[in-house]
Amino acid sequence: MPTSVDDLLRRAVENKSSDLHLKVGNHPYLRVDGLLTPLTDVPRVTPEEMLSMAFSMMTNRQKQKFKETAELDMAYGVAGLGRFRVNVFQQRGNVGMVLRVIPTKIRTSEELNLPPVINKICEEQRGLVLVTGTTGSGKSTTLAAIIDRVNATRADHIITIEDPIEFLHRDKKSFINQREVEVDTANFSTALRAALRQDPDAILVGEMRDLETISTALLAAETGHLVLSTLHTLDATETIQRIIAVFPPPEQKQIRLQLAATLKAVVSQRLVRRADDKGRVPAVEIMIATAYIRDCIINPDKTRLIHDAIAAGTSQYGMQTFDQSLFDLYSKQLITIDEALARASNADEFKLRIQGIRSASDAAREEMERQMADFERFARR
């Protein structure tokens, strides 16, 4: 019977799990294809076993921090098995843990079934690129694919700032330094400020969590660097509103201008179940910062139109909404109609589209296409 955390992690990898959940008094649980499944053949975890497993993965400094704060993020590696992102916490007076399996191989955007425009985004030399979504939506995997493509195609100096380091990048054409918060640096904002003095071409910030980090990331993008980061937001519109809302109202007009000048793309994703039940596939919203969308960022009254602009920017810019992505996945028979309808923002219009019937959104999209084309022509004058 598995008795150590390494044994349980081996079970997780063998079962192609994304996560291992451990709780005192319960069997271990694995999340496989988005569903939690108990390992009923493994004895329920005792408080002593849980504490022993947690502390076996920690350094002395991490043990001290956990005793002080009752929660800890860290990375853990098992030779010959892989790397894992670990969150340790207290619940009802006992230790609990969730361990995320980090794939050993960095998959390409094609292998991840991401839209072709992702590779175009990878060609950006400067500005801000954001990957957003809920926890477990594959943000880190997509960012790793983007960094790996830059690494393979450009002779850049890439600095990553992560908490903790997940994917390990080896130098290809690029030269990569990976820094871990609380191991190699105090925090995201400190490391980001330092990175600006380290001759970077591209900087990955694991997460933009606070005003100082967001402000420094915008400055880095504004001064000619490519900055990649994540936010826990559902789509492009919410992402833009979240960034602006972090700042005090007197500063928000300037932040809108700064964001409009630096933002290149927002990639928002959700994982949906495959039709063949062999895992999940990302449904992806892609926003490219065109002249019209930059105007929507600057003008608070037009920010709500970003979703419509994305829907209208498919053919010319490679943008797509979640529903357009779901339709594409359904058309390729990668997901079922039931899964598509369950995930669609507007299930009724999705049904009409499947039947080839025009809907109100089709007319709105065509009108938006005309508005965007007129705006782009005016902006070029």
Regions found by a protein language model. Give the residues of each.
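Short, flexible helix-loop junctions that flank or precede catalytic/ligand sites
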Residues: M1-R381
